[in-house]
Amino acid sequence: MFKPTRVLKSSQPILNSLPHAETVKMAYDLHLPKKTLHQNMNITSDEPIVFVHGIFGSKKSYATDSKLIANGTHSPVYTIDLRNHGETGHAQPFNYDTLVQDIKEFCSTHNLSNIKLVGYSLGAKVSMLAALRLPELVKSAVIIDNAPIKQPYIESYMKQYIKSMLHVDDAKISTTDKDWKRKASEAMKRYMPNATVRKNLLVNLVNKKPEGFESPAIDFENGNIQFLNPIKHMEEMAVKDVSDWPVESTEGLKFDGPVKFIRGLKSPFISPEGFKKINEHFPKNEFYDVNSAHDILDQRPSEYVKVICDFFNLQRYNSAPAHTVLGHKAPEMRV
């Protein structure tokens, strides 16, 4: 078993162990397109997009971008909170197989089919595995800067993220402090000097409990701001799982649908080994290179949104029968 480092010992004890759950009910936001292909027709896609965030992200991380994607593709976009993130419940385990089962259950609950996945970082691996395991559900995907391989080198980054978040916990910043967000960011600087990373980690920080949200890992009654992640559990539960990949169980699996990979040229996440495995698992892949590090969504927001919209629109156009109106099988006239 992995031993936590000394720095990770917070002044507050872990409240309770997390429950074990095969699937969880995922919180989500639905972004509907405001524009149509023709002003007199209600034309939308019957192929919904599911946007899967990165580690310590949430459905709110790139809500603005998701609205742009909805309008740009004329498609509903579901942004989800993975387990142990945002307003979705806390549970173990936190491995890729389990996260894919959560995606499957989510789609079943909301009657989604022919889904198009957009996954970033952690979400990219979840999306790749979902495509390989659930080809009957997934039509196509955009994978942002990750590869289907084990990546043990990212464990050190994960530990730094957790250290910085625990430092906020130890700072005991009051929920009534009007400057709580800035003070939290300052508290994180010791272990996380990168302001962009801090901003993304802070998306899960709240000064009041979300309505209906319960967790055995968070004490909302202590008067302090709280992360919506069970951060005191995350090193033992998540560090090695996030860097992992189910090599043996995916051996020989291929996804025959179109997949667009957006690669950061300054990022180490898609190595030569990763490139090889991408070609093995996703034979219909295309690459788009961005002059960016791993944080493509922050460094090149307009560019990556355009790539997603262009890719999905082209795929929809290519698959549409010649006699149908692009966008929906039966467009309804507005009255």
Curated annotation (Swiss-Prot):
Under the heading InterPro entries, the entry gives: AB_hydrolase_1, AB_hydrolase_fold
- Active site positions, chain numbering: S121 (charge relay system), D145 (charge relay system), H294 (charge relay system)
| SUPFAM superfamilies, A to Z | alpha/beta-Hydrolases (SSF53474)
User: Amino-acid biosynthesis: present as a keyword of the record?
Assistant: no
State the compartments where it is located: Mitochondrion
Q: Which Pfam families match?
A: Abhydrolase_1 (PF00561)
Question: Gene3D superfamilies, per this entry?
Answer: alpha/beta hydrolase
**AB hydrolase-1 domain: which residues?**
48-300
Give the EC number(s) under which this enzyme is classified.
Answer: 2.3.1.268, 3.1.2.1, 3.1.1.-
Protein name as annotated: Ethanol acetyltransferase 1
The coding gene here is EAT1
Picking any one GO molecular function of the record gives:
acetyl-CoA hydrolase activity
Which family is it part of? Belongs to the AB hydrolase superfamily.
